[in-house]
């Protein structure tokens, strides 16, 4: 299934500018997985395996990449689900967290990809501001660019990942060629967390 991530363009190699502003020789967009039912199920099962080690009451998806995964996980695990907007709405109820109430509950925060940790830190702040506690953050891919360390340092919350980019890269190595493999490995080596 790992190779399917490349086949469908969920993992791409080239020159990319990330939302964090960083330049990268690879790009991971797990939204592509949503259109591939078997791969989507495989990804969900990997999330479930990681979540099985956490004690939590509610699942909170990070907008927008974490929302579909959090939705399915909430359904499958029979846990209330909600999601965190980037910022509170300027209309209606003005809420930043939609869906499940987190007050007095332990939340598992779910996102697809972690780079700098900025989006996850925003979600953690929102959960706490709404009276909840964060049991942990679960991502499919930690790009290995110090995001997990930033979350731990700034919020005291541990990030659990299905894959770290170096692990994913090792599994993809036979499918992407040595030159791409080395290029990404060299890029990742600049981050010392």
UniProtKB/Swiss-Prot annotation:
SUPFAM superfamilies cross-referenced by the UniProt entry: PRTase-like (SSF53271)
GO biological process, alphabetically ordered: 'de novo' UMP biosynthetic process; pyrimidine nucleobase biosynthetic process; UMP biosynthetic process
Gene3D superfamilies: 3.40.50.2020
Class of enzymatic activity (EC top level): transferase
Family according to the record: Belongs to the purine/pyrimidine phosphoribosyltransferase family. PyrE subfamily.
PANTHER family from the UniProt entry: OROTATE PHOSPHORIBOSYLTRANSFERASE, URIDINE 5'-MONOPHOSPHATE SYNTHASE
Name of the protein described by the UniProt record: Orotate phosphoribosyltransferase
Protein's organism: Pyrobaculum aerophilum (strain ATCC 51768 / DSM 7523 / JCM 9630 / CIP 104966 / NBRC 100827 / IM2)
Phylogenetic lineage: Archaea, Thermoproteota, Thermoprotei, Thermoproteales, Thermoproteaceae
């Amino acid at each position: 299934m790992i190779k399917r991530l490349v086949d469908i363009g969920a993992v791409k190699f080239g020159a990319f500018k990330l939302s964090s502003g960083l330049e990268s020789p690879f790009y991971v967009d797990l939204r592509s997985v949503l259109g591939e039912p078997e791969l989507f199920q495989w990804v969900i099962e990997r999330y479930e395996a990681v979540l099985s080690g956490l004690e939590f009451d509610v699942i909170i998806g990070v907008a927008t990449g974490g929302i579909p995964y959090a939705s399915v996980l909430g359904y499958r695990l029979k846990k209330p689900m909600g999601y965190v907007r980037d910022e509170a709405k300027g209309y209606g109820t003005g809420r930043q967290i939609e869906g499940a109430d987190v007050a007095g509950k332990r939340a598992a925060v779910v996102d697809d990809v972690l780079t700098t940790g900025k989006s996850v830190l925003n979600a953690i702040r929102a959960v706490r501001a709404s009276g909840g506690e964060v049991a942990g953050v679960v991502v499919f891919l930690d790009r290995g660019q110090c995001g997990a360390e930033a979350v731990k340092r700034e919020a005291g919350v541990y990030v659990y990942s299905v894959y770290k980019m170096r692990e994913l890269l090792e599994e993809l190595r036979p499918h992407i060629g040595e030159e791409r493999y080395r290029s990404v490995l060299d890029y990742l080596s600049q981050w010392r967390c």
